[in-house]
């Protein structure tokens, strides 16, 4: 009887939606942070006045949907844990 009860408890726990949250890197600290359920991670890059000497500006974050950006701004969105690491310079 105890085995049956334990099995039912385990199956119930496995079948419940436990409110999975995604982990995304967030700037300025580039730390991995829990984001709300259903959000996506993003990496946004663009050039400013110092692009030739410092490289592209980078913003990492999470949002309910992939953000809309202006022309000249690149964005990549993803939906797995820590899928938006700080880009390496070529």
Curated annotation (Swiss-Prot):
Subcellular location: Secreted
One Pfam family here: Toxin_cobra-type
A cellular component annotation (GO) from this entry: extracellular region
InterPro entries in the record: Snake_3FTx, Snake_toxin-like_sf, Snake_toxin_con_site, Toxin_cobra-type
Transmembrane stretches, start-end: none
Domain of life (superkingdom): Eukaryota
Keywords: Acetylcholine receptor inhibiting toxin, Disulfide bond, Ion channel impairing toxin, Neurotoxin, Postsynaptic neurotoxin, Secreted, Signal, Toxin
Intrachain disulfide bonds: 24-41, 35-62, 47-51, 66-77, 78-83
Tissue: Expressed by the venom gland.
UniProt protein name: Long neurotoxin 7
Organism of provenance: Naja sputatrix (Malayan spitting cobra)
């Amino acid at each position: 009887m105890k085995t049956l009860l334990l099995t039912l408890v385990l199956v119930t726990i496995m079948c419940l939606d436990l409110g999975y949250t995604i982990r995304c890197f967030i700037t300025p600290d580039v730390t991995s942070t829990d984001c709300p359920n259903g959000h996506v991670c993003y990496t946004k890059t663009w050039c400013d006045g110092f692009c030739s000497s410092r490289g592209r500006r980078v913003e990492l974050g999470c949002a309910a949907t992939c953000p809309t950006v202006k022309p000249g701004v690149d964005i990549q969105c993803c939906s797995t844990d820590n899928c938006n690491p700080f880009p390496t310079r070529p």
